[in-house]
Amino acid sequence: GVKELVLAGMLLASRDIVGGIEWVAHEEDKEHIDKLAEKQKKQFAGCEISGKKLGIIGLGAIGAMVANSATHLGMEVYGYDPFISIDAAWNLSRTIKHSKSLDEIYSQCDYITIHVPLTDNTRKMIDKEAFTKMKDGVVLLNFARDLLVDEEALVEALDSGKVKKYVTDFANATVAGRPGILVTPHLGASTEESEENCAVMAVKEVRDFLENGNI
């Protein structure tokens, strides 16, 4: 579900795969496209994620899965979560580094992904001040809630080059079609497996309420 989409987002932000696909689709000279591709491919070059530093804000179920998967892809993973549960902590790879503050994530990481709930305290937590603390050319991913990011500050960070790419699952007028932003139409749980799991979870919760009175 969401974990796979986050990993895909990192890959799409690292290499201009989307641009390459669009070039192939719109190139009119299909007869010689194989030779043209060799000449044009340089403009779609990027970097590998292996060896890069990934900062994960929020190590709940999804954040922990992203962290573990990223280590298998060769990334150096940093996690920040002052409220991490015991279960989540036990499930984390030992190679994941514990960050004591958000500033550590901002200053050290090439990629940052957010996995926290939207509350009064987290609303627009990624603001102008946060962007100034990040590395130049950082890639920011948001598959949690759109309002976690101050989009006005985000646009400024993109225009200045502070942020290389912003990848999000929440389309709106500010981000849709804007250079430097990759937007998917809320696809996080749009898989056959996720929908089935949601249905099973709903049945279990109803049964727990009827049998035990738990809400």
Predicted segments — roles?
Residues 77-79:
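Short beta-strand "acidic-cap" motif of Rossmann-like dinucleotide-binding folds
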Residues 1-53:
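Phosphate-binding beta-alpha-beta segment of Rossmann-like dinucleotide-binding domains, i.e.
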Residues 176-179, 187-215:
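NAD(P)-dependent dehydrogenase/reductase Rossmann-like domain
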Residues 69-70, 134:
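Aromatic pocket-lining residues of Rossmann-like dinucleotide-binding sites
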Residues 82-174, 190:
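Rossmann-like adenosine-cofactor binding region
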Residues 52, 59-60:
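Glycine-rich Rossmann-fold phosphate-binding loop(s) that bind the pyrophosphate
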Residues 3-22, 70-75, 201-214:
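Oxidoreductase and adenylate-handling cofactor-binding alpha/beta cores
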Residues 63-64:
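N-terminal Rossmann-fold NAD(P) dinucleotide-binding loop
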